[in-house]
């Protein structure tokens, strides 16, 4: 196996292990802790008619939840993705795949990403780093990634800080926006642009919307700090110190959501980054998100069993439903107008 392929696989293995065994939380908070719903002691609603359903990428969701992109490319990642997909199908929620760049150089890793046979009905998102468009990945190859997993959209993740704190990371982020526009015009499915834990600003959101991006995943600060993950991967003290110095970097998720909401118009917004519960998810919906994404606690559960993933998703959905009835919200549209105290 060529050296760069070995490095890709080793990096993916490192990322799973570090996320499961180390504290890689940002020191920033997501911001949702500052929002309090006004409790409705007399909601006049039957719990049995609470409707958490919505549509995303033209498909029906039983709840406004995305299992955010995590992993792929290794045997352990395959098991994790299979468990996540099984639960996503049963729960009627969306799922993103981990970065699929390795698939372009190591085609036999397809089994670690191919979950459509397990989850035939869900919105499924393929995924590659946006900066790879500056390093030879073509629109045709991106379409291949979509086709090979039968995805409904392609995530381009923006991970500039992570790349810059990786010894082997990509450094050239120049003229990337025109390449994103070229890809948007080429692909047969929508492009989702996603941060990885540092948030999207109003200015960046405007730029992406202008070139035709249809979905933004703000992925703000408050959850996993990928610079901290890279600090654990560092091979010398200087690399560790550089990466560790950015543990409080980024735009908190709530702030990013507010910024992006100002310019989003009718495009879909995914709120992720430090959301821990269905209550946080409800707050995200209230503040303008279309759906919300979670990863960290689901990764830990999926590394063990499908049952633990299922229990975690059931917990999140039940928290969402109880929040809805306690705010007098029969539907997600009602929830988006619920009374809050900031």
Curated annotation (Swiss-Prot):
It comes from the Bacteria. It holds the Pfam family FMN_dh. Its main location: cytoplasm. Keywords: Cytoplasm, Flavoprotein, FMN, Isomerase, Isoprene biosynthesis, Magnesium, Metal-binding, NADP. Its cofactor is FMN; NADPH; Mg(2+). GO terms for biological process: isoprenoid biosynthetic process. It is found in: Cytoplasm. Its EC number is 5.3.3.2. InterPro entries: Aldolase_TIM, FMN-dep_DH, IPdP_isomerase. The keyword Lipid biosynthesis does not apply. GO terms for molecular function: FMN binding; isopentenyl-diphosphate delta-isomerase activity; magnesium ion binding; NADPH binding; oxidoreductase activity. FMN binds at residues 68-71, 99, 127, 194, 224, 274-276, 295-296. One of its GO terms (cellular component) is cytoplasm. Substrate binds at residues 11-12, 99-101, 162. Mg(2+) binds at residue 163. The keyword Cell wall biogenesis/degradation does not apply. It catalyses: isopentenyl diphosphate = dimethylallyl diphosphate. Gene3D superfamilies: Aldolase class I. It is an enzyme of class 5 (isomerase). Belongs to the IPP isomerase type 2 family. Homooctamer. Dimer of tetramers. Involved in the biosynthesis of isoprenoids. Catalyzes the 1,3-allylic rearrangement of the homoallylic substrate isopentenyl (IPP) to its allylic isomer, dimethylallyl diphosphate (DMAPP). This is Isopentenyl-diphosphate delta-isomerase.
């Amino acid at each position: 196996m060529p050296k760069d392929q070995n490095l890709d696989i080793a990096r993916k293995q490192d990322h799973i292990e570090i996320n499961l065994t180390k504290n890689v939380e940002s020191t920033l908070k997501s911001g949702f802790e500052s929002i309090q719903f006004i409790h409705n002691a007399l909601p006049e609603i039957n719990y049995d008619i609470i409707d958490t359903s919505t549509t995303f990428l033209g498909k029906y969701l039983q709840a406004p939840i995305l299992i955010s992109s995590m992993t792929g490319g290794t045997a352990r990642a395959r098991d994790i993705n299979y468990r996540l997909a099984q639960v996503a199908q049963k729960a009627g929620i969306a799922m993103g795949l981990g970065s699929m760049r390795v698939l372009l150089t190591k085609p036999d890793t397809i089994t670690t990403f191919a979950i459509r046979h397990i989850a035939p009905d869900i919105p499924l998102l393929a995924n590659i780093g946006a900066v790879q468009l500056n390093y030879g990945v073509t629109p045709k190859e991106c379409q291949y990634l979509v086709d090979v997993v039968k995805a409904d959209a392609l995530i381009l993740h923006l991970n500039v800080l992570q790349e810059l704190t990786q010894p082997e990371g990509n450094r050239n982020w120049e003229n990337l926006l025109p390449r994103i526009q070229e890809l948007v015009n080429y692909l047969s499915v929508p492009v989702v642009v996603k941060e990885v834990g540092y948030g999207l600003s109003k200015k960046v959101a405007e730029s992406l919307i202008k070139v035709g991006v249809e979905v933004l995943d703000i992925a703000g600060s408050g959850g996993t700090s990928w610079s901290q993950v890279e600090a654990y991967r560092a091979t010398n003290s200087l690399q560790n110190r550089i990466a560790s110095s950015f543990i409080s970097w980024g735009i908190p998720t709530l702030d990013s959501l507010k910024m992006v909401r100002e310019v989003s118009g009718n495009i879909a917004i995914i709120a992720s980054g430090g959301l821990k519960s269905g209550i946080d998810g409800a707050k995200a919906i209230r503040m303008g998100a279309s759906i919300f994404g979670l990863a960290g606690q689901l990764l830990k559960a999926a590394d063990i069993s499908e049952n633990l993933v299922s229990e975690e998703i059931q917990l999140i959905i039940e928290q969402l439903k109880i929040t809805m009835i306690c705010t007098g919200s029969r539907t997600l549209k009602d929830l988006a107008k619920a009374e809050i105290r900031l």
